[in-house]
Amino acid sequence: VLYYQGEMKDLDCMNTVGIVGARRCSQDIKKKCYELTEKYVEENKVIISGLAKGIDACAHTACINADGYTVAILGNGLDICYPSEHRILMDRIKEKGLLLSEYPPGTKPTKYAFPKRNRLISAWSDKVVVIAPGKGSGALITEGYARKYSRKIELYEVK
């Protein structure tokens, strides 16, 4: 079962790009994320990410600002905003894109939920872009699933 809020489009026939990476990142890394996201939106790609701090939020924001369609896959119920400071971004995604979760309403985020969320990001993406992942980063879990699912992978190390 998948729960959703927002505008559900036929994602099976769309070109989708998952964008994940560092939660703590410099302005240079965020700039690279914005540039890549804008390029993919110009190519009519759907941007998929996980609403986490850092690269995820940057990708969703850049996509919306470029009038693209973004999907946020959550590691909790749709009625819970995590992280809480992303409430405005979450509301913008509901208006201009799609929130998606395999967790029923009321489900709080746990450390076990995020690797499962990362699995869905890879599964729904034709290509996964990993930007400046740190050691032990959840972005590397997403990359691992992308390899398992034979997805295209782009890795960007930005200093």
What feature does the model see in each segment?
Residues V1-K159:
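Glycine-biased, small-residue-rich flexible motifs in mid-sequence functional cores and linkers
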